Amino acid sequence: MSQGSDFAARIYAAINARDRAAIKALTAPDIVVKTTVEAYRGPEALIEWMDEGDDAFEDFTVDLLEVEELAGHVVVSMRQRGRGKASGAEVANHLIHVWALRDGRGISLQSFSDREDAVRHARRSAGG
């Protein structure tokens, strides 16, 4: 398993398990997390994102669909699923996460709703 695939498996397993210690261990102290809506900074950023999902949804989980290493980044196609606490409606949305790693830890995470935008971001961030 490649470093990127291993990292993706471990970080999303930690998110699904709500394992705060593992999330902190897998991310750098200066990680920058940019969702499609807002930005967060620091390891608590992923935990805040996870908690926001738990506040809005029952059974909030993330399913990995595809992991690819591209231009020095880890590009993860994933699906978030849950059931709305207020409405009871099943919700699933498809996102692409682009991770940058340093020494095996996440230093940045950018969310995209479109794969081509994610690929462009990875290539541009790598200077290509």
Annotated model-derived regions:
Residues 71-80:
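A short hydrophobic beta-strand element
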Residues 1-26, 69, 123-128:
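Short, low-complexity N-terminal intrinsically disordered segments enriched in polar/charged residues
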Residues 59-62, 91-96:
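Short, surface-exposed coil-to-beta transition loops
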Residues 80-82, 101:
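Hydrophobic beta-strand positions in extracellular immunoglobulin-like domains
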Residues 34, 77, 109-110:
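Beta-strand residues in well-ordered beta-sheet regions across diverse protein folds
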Residues 82-90:
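Short, cysteine-centered beta-strand-loop-beta hairpins and adjacent loop/turn segments enriched
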Residues 20-24, 28-72:
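A solvent-exposed, acidic/Ser-Thr-rich amphipathic alpha-helical stretch
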Residues 96-120:
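Short beta-strand edge/turn micro-motifs at domain boundaries
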